[in-house]
Amino acid sequence: KDNKIMEKVYTVKEVREQVKAWRREGLTVGLVPTMGYLHEGHASLIKKAVEQNDKVVVSVFLNPTQFGPTEDLEAYPRDFEADCKLCESIGAAMVFHPEPSEMYAPDFCTWVDMDVLSKTLCGKSRPIHFRGVCTVVSKLFNIVTPDRAYFGQKDAQQLAIIRRMVRDLNMDIEIVGCPIVREEDGLAKSSRNTYLNEEERKAALILSKAVFLGKKMVEDGETSAVAVKEAMIKKIESEPMAKIDYVEAVDGLSMQPVEEIKAPVLVAMAVYIGKTRLIDNFIVE
């Protein structure tokens, strides 16, 4: 691959022109949609994209429509310079970093919403979240028209929802899910980990401990969702700083609760450590 200097682009028009030029050369295009403050989890997505496509676009857009009124949009960490360095070092061809006004006109009123999948798990406590996700991802797909798009399995419900959206709306894009990347001690990498103080950071390990416990139970032959959930809940409750939002076992495609654990099943959780809401999961394939 030619190590041409990575482009930083701020408008839809510029992205379209560049992608059209690549298409004329017969090049394939991969998209990695992010909200910025990139970490090794994002890096693994970008690497995969660079392996599988001639050109890779990374979008860095802190999407306001997927945050509720009381959520952490204003506090969400940002470091665009560092994001660009990371993207360039891995071999991305372009970073697309639009202003909210470039993505949402003042009279914007069209939403991509989902009846079923977005109402469970994270959708219960974040009711408009997935509407914002689906809408912005649809827009990015229309702007970039990628051959493939890359998402992390840490946001497993988001991944399932995007796969369904692509199927239901006949979007000609291959969705590639990439495994969770963890810190050495097991904590799933997340931009929100930066909110944790030292004590909370230690307490946050209870999520991955519960995930590994549940995973081991399933590997050892446990098929009762209730048994796995109860063991995981008990584990999380042993950490006084942890407050459970949910621990659920759901069908990997429909996101509906299951009683029996047989593939494909997603076992997912959201847990507050202090004020910070963290998620983790494992997939039974």
Label the predicted regions:
Residues 231-285:
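Phosphate/ribose-recognition catalytic cores of enzymes acting on nucleotide-derived substrates
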Residues 3-241, 250-252:
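Nucleotidyltransferase catalytic core that binds NTPs
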